Amino acid sequence: MNKIVVLTGPTASGKSSLSIQMAQRLNGEIVSADSMQIYRNLDVGTAKVTKEEQNIVPHHLIDIVDLTANYSVGDFIIAADKVIADIISRGKLPIIVGGTGLYVKALLGFQELEYAASDTEEVHKLNAYELDKLVVELKSLDINRAQKVDLKNKQRVIRAIQIAKYGKKDAKLTQRPKYDALVIGLDWPRELLYERINHRVTQMVQDGVLKEAQTILDAGGEKLQSGKAIGYKEFFPYLRDQVTLDKAINQLQQDSRRYAKRQLTYLRHQIPGLVWLKGQTAELRLTEMIEGWLSLK
């Protein structure tokens, strides 16, 4: 199997900066495994690497869809497999970087998924319908599938309708390892991680996250997949003059800390073979660890 390196961990753990250093030293290219960095023009709230950083090392699967688009795990796997194959064909090392645990798990082959390729135009049409009507349509198409889907989650109902309509596009991601992967997680003492998260949120406000949140709100707000993300939805009440900015900031800090805790729990229980490194000293050990692993046949 082809070798890849995966660098994961909770939000604000330092994955992006460390991955750039790794890629420079190991002749690698970075493949984002972040479910929000796929969106164009959402840079601050997603903690996306800068254009200058992207010029230092090639980054893939960043800025690939509009902020109104839906994007599934299946879409990610299709795109990531193609990018990884291309990187390997050019003699470089694919370095997968991101904290979206389901993306990582599925890419490694430990998650069986059923998916249909996204049809953006149809998704827009389906989004215009009320949830009740979508549920009725899904039940009429495939009652068995309807019984397995969270019927209160509009996006999952829409995805189920797509799969039910286009059975020929269904596919199974087999539950077996697809790559020879070294999977590394960055771990921080909770107090330090929370400090980093709180600081990041403050910096995001200074860097213009409110402008991005307003753009999402104008395009549909919570109705959009991008509008449900931590980092933007917390500012919608402020932009609607319902709460103060301080309250919105505090809410985002709290939501981000809770999200980090969930990320850690998921990664520890769902990703087989993950090796944890202390975030404070990971840079000192990482390159040597990877070089030793790459030398193994």
Curated annotation (Swiss-Prot):
Catalytic reactions on record: adenosine(37) in tRNA + dimethylallyl diphosphate = N(6)-dimethylallyladenosine(37) in tRNA + diphosphate
EC number(s) recorded for this UniProt protein: 2.5.1.75
GO BP term, pick one: tRNA modification
Site (Interaction with substrate tRNA) residue list: T100
InterPro entries (UniProt xref): Dimethylallyltransferase, IPT, P-loop_NTPase
Subunit annotation: Monomer.
Identification of the protein by name: tRNA dimethylallyltransferase
Gene name of the record: miaA
